[in-house]
Regions:
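Short beta-strand segments
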Residues: 27, 57, 82-88, 106, ...
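Buried hydrophobic positions in well-ordered alpha/beta secondary-structure cores of metabolic enzymes
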Residues: 10, 21-24, 42, 66, ...
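Condensing-enzyme catalytic core mediating Claisen C-C bond formation in acyl metabolism
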Residues: 1, 98-174, 178, 182-185
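Conserved catalytic cysteine-centered active-site region
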Residues: 1, 28-82, 121
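Short, well-ordered, mixed-charge alpha-helical segments that flank or form enzyme active sites
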Residues: 32-35, 62-65, 90-95, 136-139
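Flexible, glycine-rich active-site loops centered on histidine and acidic residues
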Residues: 75-109
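Phosphate/pyrophosphate-binding loops at sites that engage ATP/ADP/AMP, CoA/4′-phosphopantetheine
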Residues: 6-22, 183-190
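Structural motif
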Residues: 22-23, 80-83, 110-112, 125-126
Length: 190
């Protein structure tokens, strides 16, 4: 529901109706259900036309991944506009006893409409630069151990609180700062 409200607000702010959107991309790691996608739920709730609608799971960087993907889809001519939404409901996967982690996460959503500038020169730059990195070697630094197909939620996993978010905060912070610094340097070099 947060994603729907964010999408409505973005469309209203842009002065367009959801029916004129060419694509809907939702970044979330806390979908209401495994499927259909949250983007399809948003599409239906907004009354949007049957257009490209899909989810992206990239956690904290998901919104940036979404905007970058929207830019690529527009530049390739696939779409003229893309509603990009990032929505998370982390409160349901937080262990209140883990104060170091629980205080860092919450629930929220934001959205932006990325559009092709009609009057722009064909070589207009659009988004000037993006550098996105993922580091799979840090897989265990922030995780929800149970709930996927590898380890479905069951009595034992619930007793062990394995359906709750776990994070090694200091290690995540160090990695994020290092990657953010490198991304900024790389973008500025362009």
């Amino acid at each position: 529901d947060l994603a729907v409200v964010a999408g409505q607000c973005a469309c209203e702010a842009a002065g367009i109706t959801p029916q004129s959107v060419d694509a809907i991309l939702v970044s979330t790691t806390s979908p209401d259900s495994a499927f259909p996608s949250t983007a399809c739920h948003v599409q239906r709730a907004l009354g949007a036309n049957p257009v490209m609608a899909f989810d992206l799971s990239a956690s904290c960087s998901g919104f940036l991944y979404g905007v970058s993907m929207a830019d690529v889809m527009i530049r390739s001519g696939q779409v003229r506009s893309c509603l990009v939404i990032a929505a998370e409901v982390k409160s349901r996967s937080l262990d209140a006893r883990d104060r170091e982690t629980a205080m860092l996460f919450g629930d929220g959503a934001g959205a932006v409409l990325v559009v092709q500038e009609v009057s722009a020169h064909p070589d207009a730059p659009g988004i000037l630069g993006v550098r996105l990195y993922a580091d799979g070697s840090g897989h265990g630094l922030i995780t929800i151990p149970a709930g996927g197909s590898r380890k479905p939620v069951g009595v034992d996993t619930v007793r062990a609180s394995e359906h709750m978010l776990r994070m090694q905060g200091r290690a995540v912070f160090r990695s994020a700062v290092r990657r953010l610094e490198q991304a900024m340097i790389d973008v500025l070099k362009e």
